């Protein structure tokens, strides 16, 4: 199955993707929430088609370019969950003339430029910052939010959809209780802001949230309207660390050719470095890596069962990366069975970054 792999390659287990997506759909259905999955994790038409086979008709992307890619494969309802880039107004108009598109704003300049330059209607989402401090208006500043809604109301082509947030704080904690506490805090703030906007005359606003740890761990989604998780399709080492999934649910591995073996330092070196795995690291997880890294790692080695991975190989992790090299610590017995030219299957810390880096070298099984 892997004879054709000659360079670092993202291997995608389609059966695991389908199972992960089915589980997330079930969680959304139990909460009566529309699932609008983020497609940036995989950026792959094959995965998008799995979603659509399961009944999903709307998606989320992070750029106009990505929206064009998926629109070409039949997606006709996409939200660009990134602050609108006004330099792409021509591309926005071309896309909005073909499909339903949602745009994200948090300032009046963007709203005014869109109102003046749009040729087709778009859905407009106001970005709210519930604590990530990246983009968005604070839910504690309802007057600023109302002013933005008022600005948008003056244009017949700006259809105000609602309030949108992404609470990245959930990626920095671990376990159901900690993730749930942050989710409840953020969702409650969003729902309160919607109620306040209703008092100011802006009724019918939807609330859209989106992060995989919350969507995977929180049982009660508190009545929000829409959820936009994306990483759940693949999961990764970071999600294992938050408790969002078990290692067995990770649907991707980076297949890296072994180029050197160094028993004297308990290491192998693979062709698979920062440009393939990224430089994002993950704190050690002793329960999954007995004898594992003291501080952090750049990926873990999957235990292979035939042609499929299932859990982690004990005591095996990527201790460091340079541009093309990956230095992999391994236990002596596992190292003794390894040969130069073999493949090691690495669980990436952040599958979104690995998938983007290896989008031209992806192998589906």
Model features per residue range: what roles?
Residues 1-12:
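Generic N-terminal amphipathic, Lys/Arg-enriched alpha-helix
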Residues 34, 199-206, 355-359:
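Flexible, glycine/charged-enriched surface loops at secondary-structure junctions
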Residues 123, 130-246:
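Active-site loop/helix belt of alpha/beta enzymes
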Residues 265-365:
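C-terminal accessory subdomain/extension
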